[in-house]
UniProtKB/Swiss-Prot annotation:
Keywords: Acetylation, Cytoplasm, Isopeptide bond, Nucleus, Phosphoprotein, Protein synthesis inhibitor, Translation regulation, Ubl conjugation. This is Eukaryotic translation initiation factor 4E-binding protein 1. A motif (TOS motif) lies at residues 113-117. A motif (YXXXXLphi motif) lies at residues 53-59. One of its GO terms (molecular function) is translation repressor activity. The TOS motif mediates interaction with RPTOR, leading to promote phosphorylation by mTORC1 complex. Repressor of translation initiation that regulates EIF4E activity by preventing its assembly into the eIF4F complex: hypophosphorylated form competes with EIF4G1/EIF4G3 and strongly binds to EIF4E, leading to repress translation. In contrast, hyperphosphorylated form dissociates from EIF4E, allowing interaction between EIF4G1/EIF4G3 and EIF4E, leading to initiation of translation. Mediates the regulation of protein translation by hormones, growth factors and other stimuli that signal through the MAP kinase and mTORC1 pathways. InterPro entries: EIF4EBP. Hypophosphorylated EIF4EBP1 competes with EIF4G1/EIF4G3 to interact with EIF4E; insulin stimulated MAP-kinase (MAPK1 and MAPK3) or mTORC1 phosphorylation of EIF4EBP1 causes dissociation of the complex allowing EIF4G1/EIF4G3 to bind and consequent initiation of translation. Interacts (via TOS motif) with RPTOR; promoting phosphorylation by mTORC1. It comes from Mus musculus (Mouse).
């Protein structure tokens, strides 16, 4: 590289944008905050770099052989990562299970957790 060479600069151009007017935040569900109407996804890194994933690229990744191959050293979880076993599940007797009237709700509703107040 010679000392007399100069770097050429490309002229700057405006980035094409399209604005979509949303009348209410209800039109954009929380899961769609990082998507565009065309289906492009974007995210940012902790350093502030914006990564843009085109819909076409994501659809190609979905059909790639790598996406259909399970990861190495995946634990065997019956019914999740491996087929369910043919053994019937162990039945616990009623004396082994603690039951309280709070656990049995009308209409099949069960509490997610217990809280002492």
């Amino acid at each position: 590289m010679s000392a007399g060479s100069s770097c050429s600069q490309t002229p700057s151009r405006a980035i094409p944008t399209r604005r979509v007017a949303l009348g209410d935040g209800v039109q954009l569900p929380p899961g769609d905050y990082s998507t565009t109407p065309g289906g492009t996804l974007f995210s940012t890194t902790p350093g502030g770099t914006r990564i843009i994933y085109d819909r076409k690229f994501l659809m190609e990744c979905r059909n790639s052989p790598v996406a259909k191959t399970p990861p190495k050293d995946l634990p065997a979880i019956p019914g999740v990562t491996s087929p369910t076993s043919d053994e019937p599940p162990m039945q616990a007797s009623q004396s082994q299970l603690p039951s309280s009237p709070e656990d049995k709700r009308a209409g099949g509703e069960e509490s997610q957790f217990e809280m002492d107040i």
